[in-house]
Amino acid sequence: MNAAPGRPKQARTAARQGEGIPMNGHAPLAITLGDPAGIGPEIIAKAFRQAPDATRGAFVAGDVAAMRRASQALALPGQPAWPVARIERIAEAAAVPPGCIPVLQVVAAPAEDIVPGRISAEAGRVAGHCVVWAARAALRGEIAAIVTAPLHKEALAAAGFPYPGHTELLQAEAAAHAGLAVDGMPVRMMLANDELRTVLVSIHMSLRDAITAVSFGSVLETLRITHRALQRMLGRAPRIGVAGLNPHAGEGGLFGSEERDIIAPAIAAALAEGIDAHGPYAPDTVFMRARARPGVPGSGEFDVVIAMYHDQGLIPVKYLGVEKGVNVTLGLPLVRTSPDHGTAFDIAGTGRADASSLVEALRMARTLAGA
């Protein structure tokens, strides 16, 4: 798999102009625009307005006009829109006064080509190139972390990006930067809130393919990546619970043999490497065992649950509140977080989108990056 399509002229110009770190020595956080036909620009504007502590020193990698349209749409009756400040270099983000949204012009999103709530190749192009620009800036050390606003996978594909989502696009960029094949840089997706964390063995694929993807190697690699990442986050070895693939974790082979033949041997191999992993457990109860009491970190039986496929892991976290969830990509040589929701085309342009998950993603990114 190759890296993403080359950047347009606007992105190349922004990359040249964006070089440099602020004079305080701290690289800022970059927030990618997301799909401009979705709620990305809106929740970014709301985050700057509602959570100045989380957005402090951050900037938007995107399109100035798109952010101004979003800010204007959110203006309260009788009050001016939240100002959007165009910056020419990354280093200028720190100097933008509070009450402004700093935007580095990465790629144009013409209003006539973007319709709120409508899938289009143009919107996918804009969203994809913002992510590519941010990935390359992070890999050069120019930004401390990337916080990605939602993109639409169908629009991304229509624009010619051969990736099912952010995670795979960032993986390809990081692998290319390191001179590796994509499979030489394995990554995993973690969804987390203040009560529960889960890491997925497979990400964006059909359920049929996800079952096939459960192998000794993929489960062991997931355990290794999770152990390393959570050890850095927590400052100690994490307690890892592993969900089975089948109902009741296979019930001793009655409902499937994957637990006995694949998952349990991978856990045993991880234990031999010093990883504190346990299971496989019945998928319908392991998440409850891992759930921490609100406000009491670490009070669950496990710090994280390894889920065998996308919906098995994401449903429990999202059920606890989409507004609290944060997506973290593990295994990359950069920090990337995102809100735990999509483009919400059904409410795009209405001003109803909730920025809470984006704010939590910003706070998580700042913590992970030490920014």
Where in the sequence are the language-model features?
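Small-molecule pocket liners
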Residues: A58, T167, V187-R188, L196-V199
